[in-house]
Amino acid sequence: MSSLPVAAVLPELLSALRHAPQVLLNAPTGAGKSTWLPLQILAEGNINGRIILLEPRRLAARNVAQRLAELLGEKPGETVGYRMRAETCVGPNTRLEVVTEGILTRMIQRDPELSGVGLAILDEFHERSLQADLALALLLDVQQGLRDDLKLLIMSATLDNERLQRLLPEAPVIVSEGRAFPVERRFLPLPAHQRFDEAVAVAAAELLRSENGSMLLFLPGVGEIQRVQERLAERVASDVILCPLYGALPLSEQRKAILPAPAGMRKVVLATNIAETSLTIEGIRLVVDSAQERVARFDARTGLTRLVTQRISQASMTQRAGRAGRLEPGICLHLLAKEQAERAAAQGDPEILQSDLSSLLLELLQWGCQDPAQLSWLDLPPATNLAAARRLLTDLSALEGERLSAHGRKMAALGNDPRLAAMLTAAEDADSAATAAKLAAILEEPPRGGNSDLSAAFARQQGNWQQRAQQLMKRLAFRGGQPDADSIAALLASAFADRIAHRRGQEGRYQLANGMGAMLDADDALGRHEWLIAPLLLQGSASPDARILLALPVDIHALIEQCPALARRSDIVEWDEALGTLKAWRRTCIGRLVIKTQPLAKPSEEELHQAMLNGIREKGLSVLSWTPEAEQLRLRLHCAARWLPEEAWPAVDEASLLASLERWLLPQMAGVHSLRALKALDVRQALQNWLPWPLRQKLDSELPTHYTVPTGSRIAIRYHDDNPPALAVRMQEMFGEATTPTIAQGRVPLVLELLSPAQRPLQITRDLGAFWQGSYREVQKEMKGRYPKHVWPDDPANTAPTRRTKKYS
């Protein structure tokens, strides 16, 4: 084994681990970094404590553990063990544990010091899974605050060294060149006129005919694997075995795909990107790369994940091609043009930038970290997705302010997806716990085959579900319960209330309680049910409606009886403007879904008034009768806030008045029971009564409604939103006034509109004194001829004012 490529850098690596808290190892697939190196570190690395080796996938974790144990002549559970969901194989003498991602996070949460652990190894880190990024952030925090003696080794086939070195500038970088045979890389664009699965099968069959050896065929998803397998089966010889390989396959089926082909046989492994790096598949010499992958992208707006088929990065193409050169010179056929390959992105996007972050946020809050920026990340979790995660945790009653509630702490301790954790913690006895545990097991590994009826899946006795349910029952500290189909709906509603669905007019179309649309296949038998709970949804790319993958028919009225808190009852009164009347009814809702509506014979005055206020807010203040006096009062208050800002004037713009209807309008509405009475309401009086007495006095003295001119006439002042206040007065009544009158403690001059005897404007001025001494002369000349019976003095500033003609002056 010492001939493995990574053996050449072992002394350098051991030295780095002795002297540095973090070490980066870059070693290509097949170099021995997973299946040989950990044993050498265990034997020679002077590690003080156990070694934890993180593998991103369950199959890889089990295979690595078995291989390491074989090298020691042992079985897993002795020196080398493994831990994964629903399966643990460790013993009292285990010193090297191979674990999957969620398991490592649970270990850190339960024992933040990682007592007894000397080294944590993160393998295949280039895959940048969400859990791997979280594990790195938590481990670095442990090193900084609790365990400066803990060692961390980050291993990858294609490390993003530049970014990791920015995050860990002191970490030594060890590079193993690896051992790979030459790979001839060919490029073949698929014909545009041919179906994808047909074209891929033709290209793969042709390569099999012209070359010897087994083949690894990369496809974006399970559907493509199944369809290409059908097409390829028609085209290959009898000595070729077709083996699918994807994450949802049972582990026994996955193992068949990675074992060598029987003697005299060839094998074609049809795989998703699960086979890019973390699994060693025996006997592969040929690779056909569809150059596509299917990735999950979270939509923060809908709270759903959609699957997107996209071109892979150049780094992934290189990894896929490398699979052909592990044992001998090989061939990789990329199913796209070389120019397209060269234009592909250099690296793929990490999961943390495009995933649902509710589980991550729950883990961070359990860790005591309210702000993710407090930890060290290669990529900071996006604020938009974090906000969506916070909304979900709030809806699940997991938060009190910025921290976890008592319920949230129970959820976090389980280590499940937040919705499933909420459902599990809702169990109150052994039977409901058994029901919740089985439901969680089903939703973690949903059934395949197109049956969307959750009740049918629940009735099945499937081994992996039963094993997982038993594990969850232990976590819940319940024993002996029996799953009860009658409690499924209530348990689902505790975590998926927003996914209660009501059938719309079209067949298979539903509306969810969160307002979104959802749909079943047109021929799905579930479509005959009026109400469903749909815990498993997928956001489609072709339709705005989500696709229902798994759902339960429910009796909505029985569900509300079981879970009264689900429903919101409200008495609603709305006006019918066409009829000039108010309509009242009692409405029962779950989210945005109306369950039942009943007429209300006699709503209370409070309900009537609230309906009127709601109607005003919807239609605007114009529904009230704004007399000129009411509008002028509003404008005086508006101006007072600008001119006398030292006083606490109420805001009277439309938005503010609508927001404060309960404070200024409602007190005037006693006895108002109809729209006619509402329209007769005195708005001016309502605004005036809203003002405290001192402010009312201040307003009347400093922004009066009228100004008394020299003749003693009280002339109305006109106030405006944006223009200065104006006074329209006959010029003769202003004789004897030497300067422009002011208001608001002398801060604001009035604009004088000086009128002719016929009430037509002669002059508009804000400086009366300057007008008397200046342009008045021109006005005097013209007016003497036009209105000879009126007084037009040479010195108006010192002439007695008059309302009369000369005859009566």
Describe each PLM feature range.
Residues 1-423, 538, 722:
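P-loop NTPase motor module signature
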Residues 686-748:
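C-terminal accessory/binding modules appended to enzymatic or scaffolding proteins
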Residues 12, 32, 36, 59, ...:
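Generic recognition of stable, solvent-exposed alpha-helical segments in well-folded globular domains
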Residues 399, 432-517, 530-706, 745-809:
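Acidic, serine/threonine- and proline-rich low-complexity intrinsically disordered segments
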Residues 111-126, 136, 290-294, 303, ...:
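Extended active-site and interfacial segments that coordinate phosphate-rich ligands
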Residues 334-462, 466-470, 474-504, 508-522, ...:
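C-terminal accessory/connector segments of nucleic-acid motor ATPases
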Residues 181, 518, 714-716:
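Short, isolated positions in well-ordered beta-strands
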